């Protein structure tokens, strides 16, 4: 047989050069798909599905709709002052503060033989009832409204604790995939938030805040579905007799782990870092939507601004996954903390209207502010999540991870209530917020000094 004719060398090189761009484009699509397949193969598809539902749909999409809907519900339906709305926001976040309780229950109290599945079902059912009640009653008393909003928050918190326990458990059995699992959580949350904020303003405008609460029954129903589908071995009946002993053992294990310097120091850092940054987001929201001195953003625009801000969170998750996950832990926290302090000063620039002096329209500056703040916040959050997942003792993953996350939430609650106190003491209504920002300048400068002196 004769030899097949060979192409000239320069023709082969040209063909390879022409194929390289195609391979580059295909790799951009195939790489994430391969990553998802790898996670599904190593960790089971139901786990990946559960993470995407809880973080992407329940917390991301649902959380975005709930945030915008609740802010307009308090402002337009309940007609409360900014300082009151700030305090009420802290009350509805209490289920996130007591996350260790949910974690302890999922670890030591199986329901119908399951540690995780039953709690997913309960969380989904609770969310459906709470959102249905809010959507159907037009003139709810503020106490009942807070009760249902807190129940809805508890629904999301319980699902979050349960899926975090699954993540921590898998991080113990697959330590090499710990960062990948946190990236999956972060990407799901960021994409869900992006979609949720994009449509939140439109839905609030079209169907009102209570209509949005009705839509939130869908994410809660999907969480219930996760409880049906997630893979988990059934607990033997003998374990029910050991619940009291399990409580004691879990408490001892948590306390023993917390006393380690490598554990309590990051915990202290997390609390101080969040609590020192006073939060007046409700006052800023009222000012941005109502005050004549402010930009008077519409409902749709508020949703779009938050959506674009979520792009920053998504970019932060991608940047961590593909560039910073192997970066030294302390260095990453140090620089993200400094950048976080600087980003916190951007609100001051907006309220003082300095952006207009530089020719930056309000909408453009707010978008930049939201994107930068979300990106830095995600970079600051990711290494803490990875560390928290890795130091969880085996057998009490849900309890300990929930405890670590509740420390963060306690810091956020402290910042929120201190911010509400600031709004109340200085009578910072929407029209007075602008004129009283001198105090806010001094507060931010002091916070920056405190965090710079923090021993990382």
What are these regions (language model features)?
Residues 121-140, 338-359:
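C-terminal ends and interior cores of transmembrane alpha-helices
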Residues 95-102, 302-327, 335-348, 412-415:
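Transmembrane alpha-helices of Major Facilitator/SLC transporters
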Residues 1-47, 129, 135-146, 154, ...:
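Intracellular loop-helix junctions on the cytosolic face of multi-pass helical membrane proteins
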Residues 92-100, 176-204, 306-312, 405-418:
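Glycine-rich segments within core transmembrane alpha-helices of 12-TM secondary carriers
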Residues 104-111, 132-136, 193-214, 320-326, ...:
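Transmembrane alpha-helix termini and helix-breaking/packing motifs in multi-pass membrane transporters
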Residues 50, 79-94, 176-184, 284-312, ...:
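Loop-to-transmembrane helix entry
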Residues 82-83, 172-185, 299-300, 364, ...:
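Loop-to-transmembrane helix entry/capping segments in MFS-fold secondary transporters
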Residues 57, 130-132, 136-159, 356-383, ...:
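Hydrophobic core of transmembrane alpha-helices in multi-pass small-molecule transporters
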């Amino acid at each position: 047989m004769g030899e097949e004719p060979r192409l000239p060398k320069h023709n082969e090189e040209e063909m390879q050069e022409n194929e390289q761009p195609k391979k580059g484009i295909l790799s951009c699509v195939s790489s994430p798909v391969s990553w998802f397949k790898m996670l599904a193969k190593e960790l089971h598809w139901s786990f990946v599905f559960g993470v995407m539902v809880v973080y992407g749909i329940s917390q991301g999409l649902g959380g975005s709709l709930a945030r915008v809907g609740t802010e307009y519900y308090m402002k337009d339906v309940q007609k409360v002052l900014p300082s009151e709305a700030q305090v009420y926001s802290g009350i509805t976040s209490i289920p996130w503060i007591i996350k260790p309780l949910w974690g302890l229950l999922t670890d030591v109290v199986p329901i119908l033989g399951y540690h995780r599945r039953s709690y997913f079902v309960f969380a989904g059912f609770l969310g459906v009832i709470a959102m249905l009640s809010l959507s159907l009653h037009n003139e709810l008393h503020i106490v009942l409204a807070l009760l249902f909003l807190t129940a809805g928050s508890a629904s999301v918190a319980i699902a979050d604790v349960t899926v975090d326990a699954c993540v921590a458990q898998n991080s113990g059995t697959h330590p090499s995939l710990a960062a990948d699992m946190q990236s999956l959580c972060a990407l799901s949350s960021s994409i869900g938030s992006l979609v949720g904020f994009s449509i939140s303003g439109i839905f609030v405008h079209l169907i009102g805040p209570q209509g949005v609460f009705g839509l939130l029954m869908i994410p809660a129903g999907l969480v219930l579905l996760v409880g049906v589908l997630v893979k988990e071995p059934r607990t033997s009946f003998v374990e029910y007799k050991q619940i009291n002993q399990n409580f004691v053992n879990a408490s001892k294990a948590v306390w023993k782990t917390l006393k380690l310097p490598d554990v309590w120091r990051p915990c202290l850092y997390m609390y101080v870092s969040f609590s020192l940054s006073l939060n007046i987001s409700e006052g800023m929201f009222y000012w941005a939507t109502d005050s004549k001195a402010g930009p008077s953003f519409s409902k749709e625009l508020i949703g779009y601004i938050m959506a674009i801000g979520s792009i920053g969170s998504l970019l932060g998750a991608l940047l961590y996954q593909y560039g910073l996950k192997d970066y030294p832990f302390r260095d990453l926290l140090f620089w993200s903390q400094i950048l976080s302090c600087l980003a916190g000063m951007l609100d001051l620039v907006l309220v003082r209207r300095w952006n207009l002096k530089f020719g930056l329209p309000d909408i453009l500056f707010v978008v930049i502010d939201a994107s930068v703040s979300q990106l830095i916040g995600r970079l600051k959050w990711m290494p803490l999540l990875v560390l928290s997942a890795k130091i969880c003792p085996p057998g009490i993953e849900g309890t300990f991870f929930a405890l670590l996350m509740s420390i963060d939430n306690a810091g956020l609650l402290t910042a929120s209530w201190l911010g509400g106190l600031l709004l109340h003491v200085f009578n910072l209504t929407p029209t007075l917020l602008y004129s009283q920002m001198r105090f806010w300048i001094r507060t931010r400068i002091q916070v920056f000094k405190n965090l710079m002196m923090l021993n990382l």
